[in-house]
Amino acid sequence: MDTPETSTPYEQVEKGSFFSFRPQKKRVTYHLDEQVGNYHYGDKHPMKPHRITITNHLVMGYGLHNKMSVFSPRMATFGEMSEFHREDYLDFLKRVTPDNAEQFADKFQQFNIGDDCPVFDGTYEFSQRSAGASLDASRKLVQGQTDIAINWSGGLHHAKRGEASGFCYVNDIVLAILNMLRFFPRVLYIDIDIHHGDGVQQAFYESDRVLTVSFHKYNGDFFPATGNFDENGVKGGKYFALNVPLEDGIGDEQYTSLFKSIIEPTINTFQPSAIVLQCGADSLGYDRLGVFNLSIHAHGECVRFTRSFNIPMLVVGGGGYTLRNVARAWCYETSICVNEQIPSELPRETLYYEFFAPDYTLHPRLTTKIENKNTPKALEDLRIRALEQLRYLGGAPSVQMQQIPPDLTGHLEEEDERLNDEYLDKAVDVRVRG
């Protein structure tokens, strides 16, 4: 039985719409849930899902949607999310609301609910949408329907099996990788968020089929206070977690040089069948929660370099708390994925044009006054240690000896087909909202 379609090309939903699907030679898919940007963590909370809406409008304003296939994914089901997450945790997320939160207060500590991860209207549905888009993107990859799949609403890398963490409730990345492992022998996970990708590392800490590589700020205190070099995996996954702990203020040349000098030998040694690239934009200069000095060009160069290996790739978002720069970065990186050069001058017709005042440019100067504490010697030591760790991998692992993770769709095929039929019947309205 063929795997049922789980997302809808926009031309099937509304022909002639702004988001219409147009087949292109470049096999890039863009997985867009138009509702995911409508959720609100709270007035003073730094996480603003609306950044996804701004990003999408900028992408469309540049006409990049004409260079890729845009899909509207369905939300992830409880069953799909429970392939990684504990059912009691998911049940809590499904039932709790701001109105009844007091009834669940005794569970807050257990599930790490608080200031960082509050209960807001639609917490569960927001997580379903983010996870659903990453799962949909992973399906397109494993079915051979695309070479690069993009979900900017994904990348929520801190969520654990049974608790929320760091603004993340459901780990869409882990769910997508589990699905990909059913078809791809080895998956390389790369994380350029300023925060350590602890949730993904923890999920695959004993596995030699997933190699996690995280470039992040680390001083033993900066959230999540993990990701030192000595965290390198256990049991069968020993040496399959590679951490690159950095100090404040790293700039473009240092970062991109270090990234390339580690990622190239990593790919050559591990020989991944697919790559998941988490593009957290809080590593940019002037981020509200960041302490690096990266430009949008440098951040995008990591995407460009990873793309150059021509390996099937899932690209997701992540952190990023200065909204206009998040949208700029992810739009620019979308242009890299479709191999399209776009001008720095922003398109005037985009709905959020005035949001980018006063410069109205894709590449503002983002260098800050944060002192660069990364010495050339320290970075060279990191590079050498990374190469030494790669030597222990002994080449690509013997996949035949490894257990394949459970089928994310297997026993859910009938439900999946039913949900897809319902989705098509609804003829979802995908008109751009002005």
From Swiss-Prot:
It comes from the Eukaryota. Signal peptide: none annotated. It catalyses: N(6)-acetyl-L-lysyl-[histone] + H2O = L-lysyl-[histone] + acetate. Residues 26-339 are annotated as: Histone deacetylase. SUPFAM superfamilies: Arginase/deacetylase. One of its GO terms (cellular component) is cytoplasm. Keywords: Chromatin regulator, Hydrolase, Nucleus, Repressor, Transcription, Transcription regulation. GO terms for molecular function: histone deacetylase activity; histone H4K16 deacetylase activity, hydrolytic mechanism. InterPro entries: HDAC_PDAC, His_deacetylse, His_deacetylse_1, His_deacetylse_dom, His_deacetylse_dom_sf, Ureohydrolase_dom_sf. It is an enzyme of class 3 (hydrolase). The keyword Disulfide bond does not apply. It is found in: Nucleus. Its EC number is 3.5.1.98. CDD domains: HDAC_Hos2. GO terms for biological process: epigenetic regulation of gene expression; negative regulation of DNA-templated transcription; negative regulation of gene expression, epigenetic. Its main location: nucleus. The active site is at H158. PANTHER family: HISTONE DEACETYLASE 3, HISTONE DEACETYLASE HDAC1-RELATED. Belongs to the histone deacetylase family. HD type 1 subfamily. Responsible for the deacetylation of lysine residues on the N-terminal part of the core histones (H2A, H2B, H3 and H4). Histone deacetylation plays an important role in transcriptional regulation, cell cycle progression and developmental events. Histone deacetylases act via the formation of large multiprotein complexes. Is not essential. This is Histone deacetylase phd1. It comes from Schizosaccharomyces pombe (strain 972 / ATCC 24843) (Fission yeast).
